[in-house]
Structure formats: C-alpha cells, structure tokens
C-alpha cells in the first residue's frame, strides 16, 4: 500500500510539473508598441493597408525636447501595425510624432516618446493591441511660430516589412 501511495504522489507531482511547463516556457510579448522603423515616402505609399485615414492638423512649433504637440488621428487598432506620415506642412521640413494609448479626450498615456521625421516620410509602429484606442501627437521644430496647416495620413496593416 505504501508503494502505491508513493507512486501516486510522484505521478501527481509529475503531472503538476508538466502543466506548469508551457507557461514557464512562454516568451513575454511586448505589451507596448514600439517604433518598428522610420520609413521613406515610397515605403509608406507601398503599404497595402487594412484601413486608411487622412486629415488636417495645425502643426505647432515644438519645444526644445520635441515632447509637446497637438493630438490628432485617433483610431481603434484593427491591426497590430500602424504607420503615420505628415504629407505636407508649408514652411516645415520635419515633424515630431508621439504615439499615445487612449483617447484624445482623456489625454491617453504616452507609449512612445517621439521620433523626428522628414515631411513626407513616416514612422511605423508595431505591437498595437487590436481593439484598443490610440492617437498621435505631432509638432515640428521647423514650423513657423504661428504653426503650419499640415495634412496627415495613417494606415493600419498586417506586418509587411
């Protein structure tokens, strides 16, 4: 009887260890988006999007650290990748782009500080959580003091690069 109890104890311990093994081996996936890479205008134009949106924003002059800006392009992620570009901004040669999680109304939480990008080129972010709301905040170190009336384009897509 003692041998049976000992055998069952060892068997139960082995079964418990086996059930824990897959979760212990699982890799931690990034929970926050990060810049996948900066992309050229040609690369941006070649993206086959799931969704596309365009709009206008008054692009303000940035502070010295590039962290201020105006919120624009709120969206609910329908794919885990998004690219954003300022297509045109009279008087500007570059822009800063920051990605936020949440709504413009609630202010969101910053998930990527900022990237300085040439007008016409874009920033591509990956690791978005599908169904979550995001928006961008933009500014420009080369904008006139009164700002610049800029046009933007946003594309969501499955990974293509």
Residue ranges of each PLM-predicted region?
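Short proline/glycine-enriched turn/loop motifs at strand-loop junctions of beta-rich domains
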Residues: 89-94, 131
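Short strand-edge motifs at loop-to-beta-strand transitions and within beta-strands
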Residues: 121-124
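Edge beta-strands of jelly-roll/beta-sandwich modules across compartments, strongly enriched
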Residues: 95, 140-160
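Non-cytosolic beta-sheet module surface loops
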Residues: 76-77, 86-91, 140-142
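Short, surface-exposed beta-strand/strand-loop-strand elements in extracellular ectodomains
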Residues: 93-107, 113
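Noncatalytic modules at the cell exterior or secretory-pathway interfaces
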Residues: 81-84, 127-142
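N-terminal prepro-regions of secreted/extracellular proteins
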Residues: 1-72
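Short beta-strand segments within Ig-like beta-sandwich modules, predominantly Fibronectin type-III
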Residues: 113-119
